[in-house]
């Protein structure tokens, strides 16, 4: 699990990343836009997305919906971060849902690879090292649960 300092850093980070619905929508679009730009092969997992969605994650309904859904899921984890059993259950649920779609732990590692760049862009370079490390630890936990 995560230690107390990591949990605190995640909660602080979430005040910016998940402040409200429009913020989560914007940040979800930003994160997936970076993922698709950096690792175009990851698009294969999004069979319901068309070229317009990939090109404009922040303006298409499907793109915005996926972004806000992902950030809502992250928000559930962070809101529950002090309950290790709940966080573990949420991580396993996320894993089951993604494995069913052919998304592997290696694919999650690609998301982890772009996450620090995402944090810098989403926070206008105001994310602290502690917040980046805590977000990385949460992603590592999700990857480990993804079996």
UniProtKB/Swiss-Prot annotation:
Q: Which residues form the Globin domain?
A: 1-147
Which keywords, in A-to-Z order, does the entry hold? Cytoplasm, Heme, Iron, Metal-binding, Muscle protein, Oxygen transport, Transport
Molecular functions per Gene Ontology: heme binding; metal ion binding; oxygen binding; oxygen carrier activity
Q: Which Pfam families match?
A: Globin
Where do the annotations place heme b binding?
Answer: 66, 98
Q: Which GO terms describe its cellular component?
A: extracellular region; hemoglobin complex
**What InterPro entries does the record point to?**
Erythrocruorin, Globin, Globin-like_sf, Globin/Proto, Mb-like_M
- UniProt-annotated location(s): Cytoplasm
Domain of life, source organism: Eukaryota
CDD domains assigned to the protein according to its UniProt record, in alphabetical order? Mb-like
**Quaternary assembly:** Homodimer.
For this chain, the family text in UniProt reads: Belongs to the globin family.
Name this protein carries in UniProt: Globin
